[in-house]
UniProtKB/Swiss-Prot annotation:
Lineage per the UniProt record: Bacteria, Bacillati, Mycoplasmatota, Mollicutes, Entomoplasmatales
UniProt key word Ribosomal protein: no
GO process terms (BP): DNA-templated transcription elongation; regulation of DNA-templated transcription elongation
Coiled coil segments of this chain: 2-78
Described purpose of this protein according to its UniProt entry: Necessary for efficient RNA polymerase transcription elongation past template-encoded arresting sites. The arresting sites in DNA have the property of trapping a certain fraction of elongating RNA polymerases that pass through, resulting in locked ternary complexes. Cleavage of the nascent transcript by cleavage factors such as GreA or GreB allows the resumption of elongation from the new 3'terminus. GreA releases sequences of 2 to 3 nucleotides.
Protein's name in the database: Transcription elongation factor GreA
Amino acid sequence: MAKEIILTQEGIEELKHELKHLLEVVRPQVIEELVEARNQGDLSENADYDAARNRQAEVEARIKELETMISKAKLIEDSSTTDGAIKIGSKVKFIMLNTKQTREVKIVGAVEADPFKGLISNESPIAKAILGKKVGESVEVKDINAPYSIEIKEVN
């Protein structure tokens, strides 16, 4: 059986929006580009036609990928817990004990992860270390370079 793809509601909506855009805007544009390139004549040495075919293949592959991800998506429900434990979907504020730097992240599935936006994968070393933990707990993160400790300050 294929692996589930863990997504928040926002993540599913983003994928659906991208899919709709590809189906309703990009795909028709690519088809028009193909028609225009085909009308230029000899297809054997037609760079525009080759480029349009390549673009069509890329778009169709992305459409298929999005459809597969959406069909295999496992929705993360409301992240609030009665016991305060961190789970996928939780927003967590922590302090790195070695640098005293404070960070705030949201734990999401791997497909949605974007560290620059503070969205970390549930498969990341930090998420693996803090999942199931609570405010006030300190944990060691087993990083590739060197392990470090963090203290959980806030969970939303």
